[in-house]
From Swiss-Prot:
S-adenosyl-L-methionine binds at residues 72, 103, 122-127. The gene is rlmH. It catalyses: pseudouridine(1915) in 23S rRNA + S-adenosyl-L-methionine = N(3)-methylpseudouridine(1915) in 23S rRNA + S-adenosyl-L-homocysteine + H(+). It is an enzyme of class 2 (transferase). It comes from the Bacteria. It is found in: Cytoplasm. Homodimer. This is Ribosomal RNA large subunit methyltransferase H. Its main location: cytoplasm. GO terms for cellular component: cytoplasm. It comes from Salmonella arizonae (strain ATCC BAA-731 / CDC346-86 / RSK2980). Keywords: Cytoplasm, Methyltransferase, rRNA processing, S-adenosyl-L-methionine, Transferase.
Length: 155
């Protein structure tokens, strides 16, 4: 199974690149994890936000292909670490690759939400999208460590 983080936005701050890459390199060869960045639509004073969201959504869904789609969204299910580890195991047993979708400043398009098989909420707080990338990478790595009894996670 391959994990894929599909996120709106490019040109992240160095701390995001450093943090994300640190967890990316830790993933085992049998569970590769990759980042696909979708360029954010140009937002201005008179921007057509619906059109921008729709275009970003089309690109995200195209990148995900036939993968299981899991959206990251405030109204999603709040998994704790053991629950995420259980989900990771279920995804592995399912045999399909998994695409986790992070929207831009206005969130995800209706098409992305409709295509999602699952929706995960990291927090009831609104989090900056660059930070979410690092949190997701660390959370998935921690979940993997639980499923393999790796010492990274301690009870």
């Amino acid at each position: 199974m391959k994990l894929q983080l599909v996120a709106v936005g490019t040109k992240m701050p160095d701390w995001v690149q450093t943090g994300f890459t640190e967890y990316l390199r830790r993933f085992p060869k049998d569970m590769p994890f990759e980042l696909i960045e979708i360029p954010a639509g140009k937002r201005g004073k008179n921007a057509d936000i619906k059109r921008i969201l729709d275009k970003e959504g089309e690109q995200m869904l195209a990148a995900a292909g036939k993968n299981r789609i899991v959206t990251l969204d405030i109204p999603g299910k709040p998994w704790d670490t053991p629950q995420l580890a259980n989900e990771l195991e279920r995804w592995k047993q399912d045999g399909r690759d998994v695409s986790l979708l992070i929207g831009g400043p206005e969130g995800l398009s209706p098409a992305c939400k409709a295509a999602a098989e699952q929706s995960w909420s990291l927090s009831a707080l609104t989090l900056p999208h660059p930070l979410v990338r690092v949190l997701v990478a660390e959370s998935l790595y921690r979940a993997w460590s639980i499923t393999t009894n790796h010492p990274y996670h301690r009870e």
